[in-house]
Amino acid sequence: MSRLFGTDGVRGLANGLLTAELAMQLAQAAAVVLGHERSTNGARPRAVVARDPRASGEFISAAVSAGLSSSGIDVYDAGVLPTPAAAYLVADLHADFGVMISASHNPAPDNGIKFFAKGGQKLPDEVEDAIEAQMAKDPVRPTGSDVGRIQTFSDAEDRYIVHLLGTLPHRLDGLKVVLDCAHGAASGCSPQLFNDAGAEIVVIGAEPDGLNINDGVGSTHLGALQRAVVEHGADLGIAHDGDADRCLAIDHEGNEVDGDQIMAILALALKESGKLKDNVLVATVMSNLGLKIALRNAGISIRETAVGDRYVLEEMRDGGYNLGGEQSGHVIFADHATTGDGLLTGLQLAAQVALTGKSLKELATVMTKLPQLMINVKKVDKARAGTDEGVLAAVAEASAELGETGRVLLRPSGTEALVRVMVEAADMPTAERICKHLAAVVEERLAVAPAV
């Protein structure tokens, strides 16, 4: 049987893989695994439950709350909130764990369930495995006064906004900011946050109807935000995804500022203020080489991880670092959050525009993005990508040609029979030439023999 938990919780088509029955079973199992510590002390454990505004989130949330309360867990129902808000509230409430119901940037028919441990931390693999194992056992069924209660967490959003405002290094008075909330979980609190921080705001993508989340808006569809920033003469635009754990930005001319550029701006700002732990940024292997070059010149080193914010988080925890993230816009401020937080990231970025008096476009020039090209080579034996002599020789030859002006990365897909070939170079023609050559070598050398 395949593992139920993926890289970011349990995710799938609502009422397909992810049924109310499965949601309740997951909740009942999590109640045993995550609520065990306090239940042994005689007190009922507590859990925070939140969701994004997908229509299916209502029945999944109800099933989760039923599964938890019937297992002796007191539920604090926070309603529609960003994923990072749920993580923060677990810590703020001193709850035993939290549950977030969201499929992030996926389309509306999908949904997901992810858990946060005490303190708002993501679960390690072994705890997820323990929850799966518990699902095969009978749930606990307390009675009488031991049954959990469900209550509305009425000030959840206010607590989160007050927390974020407390991180501001400079107010946003005088700035005009366009917010794209992806018709998602940030639709209520992001406009409130930026308004309270002093910005003049224009809001798009903040009319969720349960079916329009991420539909033509948000961090995966930047066109609407780019147009709005230019049309309104705004200083910058901030784009969230459906659950608001990531942030991309738009400068006043309508140019995209991606996660690498955002991390460069914020890393330099933290270093200048003496707050960047060990002068280290944690980023994945997919971050642009231009980021590493710019930060190296500024006396900041990069610790590289595999792709995925969970690996960034692990490296940050292990090394005690306080800033990390991904090109996609997951940025983690360990001093203020336990996970990627798109509202916190956007707030800190806007604060740098206000604090320095420089435009976002000017701030983004701290790094020069190298042209980057990626080709997916399908129907190949991805397991041999790191051992085939012909492939390794071609990669070594390309790397030698690029020297310090570029790099080559081969990444076998975790879910498909393909290998991703990525090349960065000083110019796009060079990147294209080398990438196409390597893709051809991979296709030839790793070809899967046709079935007889």
From Swiss-Prot:
Entry's Gene Ontology BP terms: carbohydrate metabolic process; peptidoglycan biosynthetic process; UDP-N-acetylglucosamine biosynthetic process
Manner of cofactor binding, per the entry note: Binds 1 Mg(2+) ion per subunit.
GO MF annotation list: magnesium ion binding; phosphoglucosamine mutase activity; phosphomannomutase activity
Keywords for the protein's UniProt record, in alphabetical order: Isomerase, Magnesium, Metal-binding, Phosphoprotein
Active site: 104 (phosphoserine intermediate)
Post-translational modification: Activated by phosphorylation.
Pfam families assigned: PGM_PMM_I, PGM_PMM_II, PGM_PMM_III, PGM_PMM_IV
Required cofactor(s): Mg(2+)
Family annotation (CDD domains): GlmM (cd05802)
Modified residues annotated as Phosphoserine in this record: 104
Residues that bind Mg(2+): 104, 241, 243, 245
EC number: 5.4.2.10
GO cellular component: a single term: cytosol
Catalytic activity: alpha-D-glucosamine 1-phosphate = D-glucosamine 6-phosphate
EC supergroup of this enzyme: isomerase
Coiled coil (residue ranges): none
The protein's role, per its UniProt record: Catalyzes the conversion of glucosamine-6-phosphate to glucosamine-1-phosphate.
Family: Belongs to the phosphohexose mutase family.
NCBIfam families, per the entry: glmM
This protein's name: Phosphoglucosamine mutase
Species this protein is from: Arthrobacter sp. (strain FB24)
